[in-house]
Amino acid sequence: MDIKFLGNIISSLSPGQDFCIYGEVNDENDYNQNVVFTQDPSSKPTWAAVQAGQSPEQWVIVRGQRKGRLESCDWTQLEDVPLTAEKKTEWQTYRQALRDITNEPDPFNITWPTPPA
């Protein structure tokens, strides 16, 4: 889990709100893809529920990642951006695919769209 990603999650908290991050640590001492974020440490989900994709906390993580990806390409939608109409449309399509990511059935197996080149 990179620092920017963790920052996006933490920035979504209200002041004074508690949170915990659960997950396995890999050989590089980094969290794996199955990190569970919860704002209420007492509501730790069971591992079976996590593996079944029934973790609303995981959707918080996905939305945080999506927010970061959308913010990183906000510039492509500015009126005076030096992009062709075709490129701007490609970016609009990419951004819509990001917005639609919550339609995926499993928050642990997200297929992220590839940004335009």
Labelled PLM ranges:
Residues 1-117:
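A preference for well-ordered globular domain cores
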